[in-house]
């Protein structure tokens, strides 16, 4: 599988996400995140997840090495400069649009598919309104993953699968 530059924020299943094409994983410590990590624990988790990412890349025969970031808050995440063709955030809010519709709108507007996608997937129960507002202020469009609320692991894999299917030729 080619490198799909999609960055999944908050995925507990790095191997599955990376084998589905994520170039990077940036775990987000949202207000509704159950597990709280101190700096030492966060660094330890990051090292463990990076090892899993390397093993997943080897298993999948990828010719690029995915990167796993240290867990951070959403505010910290957006302080770092990033550039994506399309920025999305999973949301349970009523104005969220289906992922396939947003991809179709992007292609119609730009005459091509996006080559880099930021996909933020939140904790069960969704991001807080303040976190959604922050993401929107940084250009993220809210998407729905359907009528069923998915676990984080399932939502991440779902998003990567749809992006892979829709964007890779």
Language-model segment annotations:
Residues 129-169:
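Structured adenosyl-cofactor binding patch, chiefly the S-adenosyl-L-methionine
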Residues 40-42, 102-105, 133-135, 158:
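Short, glycine/charged-enriched secondary-structure capping and boundary segments
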Residues 72-78, 95-97, 150:
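A short acidic, often aromatic-flanked loop/helix-cap motif at beta-alpha or helix-coil junctions
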Residues 4-9, 17-20, 104-110, 134-138:
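Short, solvent-exposed amphipathic alpha-helical segments in soluble enzyme
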Residues 66, 124, 148, 152:
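Glycine- and other small-residue-rich loops at beta-strand/loop junctions that grip anionic moieties
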Residues 1-89:
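RNA substrate-binding interface of SAM-dependent RNA methyltransferases
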Residues 82-132, 141-144:
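Active-site/ligand-binding-proximal alpha/beta "capping" segment
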